[in-house]
Amino acid sequence: MSKRPADIIISTPGSKVRRRLNFDSPYSSRAAVPTVRVTKRQSWTNRPINRKPRWYRMYRSPDVPKGCEGPCKVQSFESRHDVVHIGKVMCISDVTRGIGLTHRVGKRFCVKSIYILGKIWMDENIKTKNHTNSVMFFLVRDRRPVDKPQDFGEVFNMFDNEPSTATVKNMHRDRYQVLRKWHATVTGGQYASKEQALVRRFFRVNNYVVYNQQEAGKYENHTENALMLYMACTHASNPVYATLKIRIYFYDSVSN
């Protein structure tokens, strides 16, 4: 903000006089430009970072992850799943090598954030039954991917085969890490029916993915840190359908 504004308003109880300070300016006849009034609250909120507490400097997230470079790229996965009691799995870090804004440049990139939106719903025959069904979602990092994704029952240990009690097996704790976990619930019946539930989640993960020399974006081409989405419903006999659109925002590594 200028130390010497163009106009000064001199206020008296009886009158208001506007004086101009640029008398010799060739633009002295132009209309006065209104200046934006800045309140104390705005100036305090937008104060420089060195005047803020250390917490703002320690825990702020950079725009570009460490060791990466822009631009920010996007890859979308759109699918419909038949979620059953024994679980379902999909890989959400499948990115093909290329030169576009949906491709990876080399073997390494960082998935900064994930946006998951869609719904879970029941068909006409199932929603008439009196029951409640919840879908458990697990966003998992696979640190050492091999061959093909493991099933839900191979990764998680459950009590009485109940997905709501699922935890990573002790033998896989070094390989699989649950980054996020959430659920959505639908209810069937004649009266208190909720036949569909919306799913909308945004997560910041900063997951560094490494591929091999292959160009195709497949699970078997991962060598480190594949992102997996595991799903399972809590009702043993009534399945649930999930229509999801998953977008990952990633940056290429500078070491490619």
Swiss-Prot record:
Residues spanned by motif Bipartite nuclear localization signal: 3-20, 200-247
Principal cellular location given in the protein's record: virion
Highest taxon above the source species: Viruses
A Gene Ontology molecular function term of the record: structural molecule activity
Zn finger (unnamed) start-end: 68-85
Keywords: Capsid protein, DNA-binding, Host nucleus, Host-virus interaction, Metal-binding, T=1 icosahedral capsid protein, Viral penetration into host nucleus, Virion, Virus entry into host cell, Zinc, Zinc-finger
GO cellular component: host cell; host cell nucleus; T=1 icosahedral viral capsid
Motif Nuclear export signal: where in chain: 101-122
Sequence motif Nuclear localization signal, location on chain: 40-54
Subcellular location: Virion; Host nucleus
Biological processes, Gene Ontology terms: symbiont entry into host cell; viral penetration into host nucleus
Function: Encapsidates the viral DNA into characteristic twinned ('geminate') particles. Binds the genomic viral ssDNA and shuttles it into and out of the cell nucleus. The CP of bipartite geminiviruses is not required for cell-to-cell or systemic movement.
Similarity remark: Belongs to the geminiviridae capsid protein family.
Quaternary structure note: Homomultimer. Binds to single-stranded and double-stranded viral DNA. Interacts (via nuclear localization signals) with host importin alpha-1a.
The name this protein goes by in its record: Capsid protein
Organism per entry: Indian cassava mosaic virus (ICMV)
Lineage of the species this protein comes from: Viruses, Monodnaviria, Shotokuvirae, Cressdnaviricota, Repensiviricetes
